[in-house]
Amino acid sequence: MNTVVGRRIINGRRRPRRQTRRAQRPQPVVVVQTSRATQRRPRRRRRGNNRTGRTVPTRGAGSSETFVFSKDNLAGSSSGAITFGPSLSDCPAFSNGMLKAYHEYKISMVILEFVSEASSQNSGSIAYELDPHCKLNSLSSTINKFGITKPGKRAFTASYINGTEWHDVAEDQFRILYKGNGSSSIAGSFRITIKCQFHNPKYVDEEPGPSPGPSPSPQPTPQKKYRFIVYTGVPVTRIMAQSTDDAISLYDMPSQRFRYIEDENMNWTNLDSRWYSQNSLKAIPMIIVPVPQGEWTVEISMEGYQPTSSTTDPNKDKQDGLIAYNDDLSEGWNVGIYNNVEITNNKADNTLKYGHPDMELNGCHFNQGQCLERDGDLTCHIKTTGDNASFFVVGPAVQKQSKYNYAVSYGAWTDRMMEIGMIAIALDEQGSSGSVKTERPKRVGHSMAVSTWETIKLPEKGNSEGYETSQRQDSKTPPTASGGSDTLDVEEGGLPLPVEEEIPDFVGDNPWSDLSTKNSQEEEAMSSESGLRPQLKPPGLPKPQPIRTIRNFDPTPDLVEAWRPDVNPGYSKADVAAATIIAGGSIKDGRSMIDKRNKAVLDGRKSWGSSLASSLTGGTLKASAKSEKLAKLTTSERARYERIKRQQGSTRASEFLESLLAGEDPDSRF
């Protein structure tokens, strides 16, 4: 049996045998990471039947990038340097972008191209120099140049720019320096292309999200409320007086009742007061004013007038006279630092008003330079420096001598209330940037006394605590031991003690002031119910005081004239003032004449004894003939003699003295 095997023939050719495909070995794939955040993730290939499960090997990842940037607005005279590396601020994509994603980098090529923007009429060039190691700070060679009127181009390969080695991303690779020699007009710009390779990537934080929107506008700060404070009141003190021929005695100053106004609200407050300084002739009042924390412009208006009034019924609080001021230009209204304040821009103007020589008050005339009023206007800037801040105000001195005493005579020592004057103090916080002095016209009838820019120093501790002083008074003045009154021992007949005497050391600038101090035990409250009756200090022995001996007799003219009336040159200070007014002279002319009068009074001491044969008898100066006559008078006769001399003149007083010594009755003529 024949077997026929048929072979399939297609297109005349025998069908090829089916062959099994050989499994192909997969080729290794290199995975390269780039900095493109939007790179599409490669699609995963399906695993074939014959594919092995081996891992695809990879090499160290890297990247190569090209950056193009420009340096614009180059003038023909521009100079500078372009540093390639992390300092390349002209290309943030390179310095703040790619360098932060890798550990190492190298720039393999740089193309420096000059783009001209100058006109054909301009001249000059821009020289450039390559510094491959970043060691130059300025251009050192001008071999390579670009003309500013035409473009230019220069390329540097890796070997020129230190680009064959890898560099840490924290260090710069090279630098190009340039400098032009043209004008200051715009010449063109640099267009720079760099090719850079990056090596060894590192983890970088994701890009920060969008910045938050603008914060809501803050609420407006509430406007500061400035304060305005006013103190206003009339300080008072208690005095003791007998007649207009005697000196007065002063008690310690009580606390003063002032009206306090703030933000249109009014109440009452007490201000501490005391004598700033005190001696046998005068005492200076002082009032302490508290200041709230802050900076203040302070304005003070002061009207000094010292009326006296009775303290008992039926004429209680009715004026019965006054205590006059002197015309000393060195005294007046002023302020000083008391505690935790700074005072600047101080300006104080003081004025005074003389009494007319023909005016008579309680039988006395104003013919010795007495003043009725002493006013002042003051502005300053005060800044507090701590808690319990305060400053003080001082006024003109209260004169104790009989020539300034115009209180009514009762024939016995009587207490009276005396006003210091009206004081208004305004503290303005809104004007705290500084005090501006407003020039004010002086009051009609007032004479300008003095303007000062200096503040008063804080008194010594003893001065601010009270006083027990000794004062020379008239022969009728009784000795007192409390309330700050004044005493002085005199010889029989009203003559002073010998020149050599022991007195306490003084405190302060005035050798007659601040003889001793003592703090009052209680302050007196001022109120309508109290009736202004301060409590007197209990009597007691004075404390021992340090003493010193004065051997140099150098008194003031007023003191010499009070002790020895015979040295009067024949005219008074009031006569000088009247003559100056009649002649139309100035205050300066009047003061010069008064100085001449004072010199004549002091020169009158020469008549107390011969200049060649002067001697001391019993420790005192030898009295003149007239003084010996006056020593023979009784106390009442001497007081009457002084009153006649003050009211009618020295001639009438001498006639009265002679009639007394002759044994005649002078009542019919005097």
UniProtKB/Swiss-Prot annotation:
InterPro entries named among the record's database cross-references: Luteo_coat, PLrV_ORF5
Region described as Readthrough domain (RTD): 204-670
Organism lineage string: Viruses, Riboviria, Orthornavirae, Pisuviricota, Pisoniviricetes
Parts forming coiled coils: none
Protein name: Readthrough protein P3-RTD
UniProt record similarity statement: Belongs to the luteoviruses readthrough protein family.
Residue stretches of biased makeup (Polar residues): 466-485
Disulphides: none
Signal peptide start-end: none
Biased composition (Basic residues): 10-24, 38-49
Residues covered by region (Disordered): 1-64, 203-223, 431-553, 609-629, 641-670
GO terms, molecular function: structural molecule activity
Keywords: Capsid protein, Host cell junction, Host periplasm, RNA suppression of termination, Virion
Ranges of biased composition (kind: Low complexity): 25-36, 50-60, 609-624
Site (Cleavage): 437-438
Superkingdom of origin organism: Viruses
Cellular component GO terms, alphabetical: host cell periplasmic space; host cell plasmodesma; viral capsid
Biased composition (Pro residues): 209-221, 536-545
